[in-house]
């Protein structure tokens, strides 16, 4: 099916086609969206992602200049996004919160479902609508599934979420409120089941289906809007530190800044730093070994949202092309960063604090300009949400205990 089935509801996209990251000379039409990587350059060992190309020479000159009555969120950036066939929920436009001199937190918990995933799902659900699909399917036990369910409901599509028995309470509540079909299965069974649902029902996959991560061709385009927002408020920072699982967010933010350079609005991109749990780190391993993507053993971590055994080529491109680096952070470092954010009034999921943890680990040496740490999600999304002390009733006459808690 083609995009003619449903016209875009917002703005005029300047997207012209798709191209392989493995070999940018390999190009494809814009439709249908390639959801399993590049069919030409991918090999048995590495699946290469596909990205979207645009008619950059036609980008409106005032796109990055503030003006009265300007649309907000994805609507503002429609020329540099794939066609927005599905309605939005007010995604984007999240605040940059100062945290000390020269350090800023991009707080993505202010999005409609409290995470950065709303930026990607506005785009992928739009692709599903444009392709004429009756539903979407996603493999996720966290933010991605919750967000996909919301945007599917908004677009009038069915949503199947293939998750696990350990879904955080807030995410589970999201899924059921939005009417998603939730299928908890063992992790190893997620992706074979997803592919079968795609084949049998014709649902549009909005998460990964390949052995090394490629994800949805249109998805990371939604993350570019983070770069646009940072640029319009701060200019080009010296560095951006991001929690990293598969590397889609990392790539999307890098590409947004790279587009600003291509448009003549910036003279450089910030250095991009991936921040992965030290119990795994497939991107750090791929960069260390000089390979496009790799698989690593994964140990236990509470940062479930970014714990991954396999990475993708997108992250390698972003770090390499920006002169950045791949950092590994421990749970203790993420806990300390989360506590620092909380003292500043920002409640972050443990995984979301990985960016600040990475910055604290590396320091600001040789970083030219302000630093932005992206905090991806709300503390409501953590699995271990309630403490035993907080949920137990306190005897108001037990002044010693009252005093102990206040002084702790």
Regions found by a protein language model. Name each.
Residues 2-408:
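PLP-dependent amino-acid enzyme catalytic core
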């Amino acid at each position: 099916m083609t995009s003619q089935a449903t016209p875009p509801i917002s703005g005029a996209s300047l997207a012209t086609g798709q191209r392989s990251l493995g070999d940018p000379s390999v190009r494809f039409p814009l439709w249908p969206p390639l959801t399993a990587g590049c069919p030409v350059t991918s090999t048995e060992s590495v699946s290469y992602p596909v990205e979207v190309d645009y008619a950059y020479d036609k980008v409106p000159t005032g796109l990055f200049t503030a003006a009265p009555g300007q649309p907000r969120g994805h609507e503002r950036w429609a020329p540099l996004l794939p066609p927005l066939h599905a309605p939005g929920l007010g995604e984007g436009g999240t605040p940059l919160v100062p945290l000390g001199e020269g350090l800023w937190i991009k707080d993505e918990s202010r999005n409609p479902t409290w995470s950065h995933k709303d930026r990607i799902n506005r785009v992928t659900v739009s692709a599903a609508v444009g392709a004429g699909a009756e539903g979407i399917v996603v493999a996720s036990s966290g933010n991605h599934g919750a967000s996909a369910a919301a945007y599917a409901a908004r677009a009038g599509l069915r949503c199947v979420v293939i998750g696990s028995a350990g879904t955080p309470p807030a995410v589970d509540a999201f899924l059921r409120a939005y009417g998603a079909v939730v299928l908890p299965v063992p992790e190893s069974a997620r992706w074979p089941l997803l592919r079968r649902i795609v084949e049998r029902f014709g649902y549009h996959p909005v998460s990964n289906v390949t052995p090394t991560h490629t994800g949805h061709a249109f998805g990371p385009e939604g993350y570019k809007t983070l770069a646009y927002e940072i640029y319009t408020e701060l200019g080009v920072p010296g560095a951006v530190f991001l929690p990293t699982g598969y590397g889609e967010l990392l790539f999307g933010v890098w590409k947004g800044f790279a587009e600003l350079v291509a448009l003549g609005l910036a003279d450089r991109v910030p250095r991009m730093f991936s921040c992965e749990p030290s119990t795994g780190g497939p991107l750090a391993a791929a960069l260390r070994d000089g390979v496009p993507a790799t698989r690593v053993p994964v140990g236990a971590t509470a940062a479930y949202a970014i714990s991954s055994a396999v990475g993708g080529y997108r992250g390698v491109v972003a770090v390499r092309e920006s002169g950045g680096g791949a950092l590994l952070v421990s749970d203790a470092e993420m806990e300390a960063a989360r506590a620092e954010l909380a003292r500043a009034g920002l409640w972050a999921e443990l995984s979301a604090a990985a960016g600040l943890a990475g910055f604290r680990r590396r320091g600001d040496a040789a970083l030219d300009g302000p630093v932005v740490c992206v905090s991806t999600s709300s503390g409501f999304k953590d699995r271990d949400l309630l403490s035993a002390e907080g949920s137990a009733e306190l005897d108001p006459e037990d002044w010693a205990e009252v005093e102990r808690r206040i002084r702790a």
